[in-house]
Amino acid sequence: MAALFVSLLALTSLVPVQGAATVPQTDYAKRAERVLKSAPLIDGHNDLLYAIRRSTNDQIYDGKLPFETSLKGHTDLPRMRKGRMGGQFWSVFIACPSDPNAPINTPKFATRDTLEQIDVARRLVDKYSKDLMYCDNPGCAKRAFREGKIGSFIGIEGGHQVGSSIAALRQAFYAGARYMTLTHNCDNAWATAASTVRAGKPDLGMTDFGPALIKEMNRLGMLVDLSHVSHQTMRDVLKITKAPVIFSHSSAYEVSKHLRNVPDDVLKTVAKNNGVVMVTFVSSFVKVDDPDSADVNTVVKHIFHIAEVAGWDHVGLGGDYDGTTELPKGLEDVSKYPYLIEKVLEAGATEEQARKLVGENVLRVWTEVEQIAKKIQRSGVLPVEEVWKGRNGTALSERSTFIEGPAPLEYGCD
């Protein structure tokens, strides 16, 4: 009888492997490997492209960018493969103006530079097409994973990058961008940034022009990214969006009270919205009181807190690799993802929950955003034409009599 009990106990410590032998419940490395074989690990935010811009001026054909062997930062092909990555949202980041107090309508080159970043993203993926696959929809992302490639998607990190223009946003979408973070570390014509509140200024949330942006992003099927925005902006957007939102690289405010993180009331609303919060690894965000002591378990704590408050359907991963110099011990570069999943399983997550975390959740959100967009478009909703009233620009701040009848040519074109 004792022998039978021991045998039964041994059986309970095993979990089935699809089409293979059983694996001990406590063999977290093998269980993590199984998770990453069955679901694509999709990271919500990586700034490698900005590092390329700063180091090579977006020149990738001269042999000076050894992406296929080893780069100095956090990301290259060998480490992505070691990290079992199945998909990456590449940020086409361009920094805010150097003066955060500069008027929003000050002329700048951010939109031009953003298009150049989209261009280098597409060229990089094409150059390494044996390993990477450019995708602009979730079906393609799944196909890339089945074919053993790393799905590569594009996200814009801040409304300043499209000049606070809905028409410019639309063209960025047509060029391939599939999410836009509403702000970076500067306010724009649509919303207040978290950095503004950190600087001691009031949290004004969305502007009167903000709803027009959300309406158009919903219509296009463009993911609304609420990382970097103020807490009130988060709440304002969640009240009006018709589609799920993402936080491409944010963590839990209750665990670490940094304004870049998401408070519990917003986490609960994200669950109702069916969105996803993709946990970032930046040490000063995940452990604001002692960043140097942050480690992989610190990040696991954020993952579990979001899962407890919002549910396992609403948590994902967005490391912010190559966008920070502060990373927890054990998560030094993109190769460390399997170790993180080991720790998540060791902390008590099921493999089903881990699959949701690594990629199934963000793919579900992306799919729903597309479905809602198709429904909106079928209903006959036209592109938003509204422009920001505070902008500078030829013929937009003045009204001519052209549409009312013959008028003198007020603006020369020759």
Swiss-Prot record:
InterPro entries: Metal_Hydrolase, Pept_M19. Disulfide bonds join 96-186. Pfam families: Peptidase_M19. Zn(2+) 1 binds at residues 45, 47, 157. It is an enzyme of class 3 (hydrolase). One of its GO terms (biological process) is proteolysis. Keywords: Dipeptidase, Disulfide bond, Glycoprotein, Hydrolase, Metal-binding, Metalloprotease, Protease, Signal, Zinc. Substrate binds at residues 184, 260, 320. Residues 1-20 form the signal peptide. Its EC number is 3.4.13.19. Zn(2+) 2 binds at residues 157, 228, 249. GO terms for molecular function: metal ion binding; metallodipeptidase activity. Belongs to the metallo-dependent hydrolases superfamily. Peptidase M19 family. Hydrolyzes a wide range of dipeptides. This is Putative dipeptidase TRV_05564.
